[in-house]
A protein has these predicted regions:
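Alpha-helical solenoid repeat scaffolds
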Residues: 1-198
């Protein structure tokens, strides 16, 4: 059932569906994907329903969505979005390796988080800011988002041994990974590749 619902939510990206039908569907079956949640928020807003802002904020913080939906949602929510909402969205976009949307999101992140996000965005785009001699925020070695993006970039560019060393020598994490599935999948991918080479 979950797979069918996910496919139905993905179909919303390709088809024009009336807001009342979208809202009725998601009222009965809560969204399983962030693009679905974003479409639900827009449908609720079009119908003038009070929960549109709450659902919209959750979708904004949840990460990637269709570019048109992203623009519509931002236009609708701009007055109520807080700086931490923008930082949460940027973190989710970087976990999803959504480089193009993350580049747009940089305009809205807090100054305190900007350097770390820029470093991670470079990694998502396949560039290693440290190798280019750019200064790195010192607190990143304990940040799961940075470690995920860096290990992934190293592994996908053929530097599995460096990725394994990074993950093996890291200090304890300062917070839980935003996306535990991606975190575990990357740890396993690095371990398997490193094991295959030894």
């Amino acid at each position: 059932e979950a797979k069918l619902r996910i496919r139905a939510e993905q179909a919303l990206e390709r088809e024009g569906v009336e807001p009342s039908r979208i809202a009725a569907f998601f009222d009965r079956f809560p969204p399983l994907t962030n693009p679905g949640r974003a479409r639900y928020a827009l449908a609720l807003a079009a119908l003038g329903r009070s929960e549109a802002r709450e659902v919209g904020r959750a979708a904004w913080r949840g990460g990637p969505m269709n570019d048109v939906v992203e623009a519509s949602l931002l236009a609708q929510l701009a007055p109520i979005l807080l700086p931490q909402d923008h930082d949460a969205r940027m973190d989710a976009l970087l976990w999803a390796s959504a480089g193009a949307q993350a580049e747009r999101q940089l305009l809205y992140v807090t100054p305190a988080a900007r350097a770390g996000f820029l470093t991670r965005l470079g990694l998502v785009n396949g560039r290693d800011p440290a190798a280019a001699g750019l200064p790195q925020p010192t607190d990143l070695r304990t940040a799961p988002g940075y470690l995920y993006n860096r290990a992934r970039m190293l592994r996908t560019s053929g530097q599995t041994a460096t990725a394994a060393a990074l993950l093996a020598s890291r200090p304890p994490l300062t917070e839980r990974p935003l996306d535990p599935r991606r975190w575990i999948a990357e740890l396993l991918a690095v371990a398997r590749k490193a094991d295959a080479r030894s």
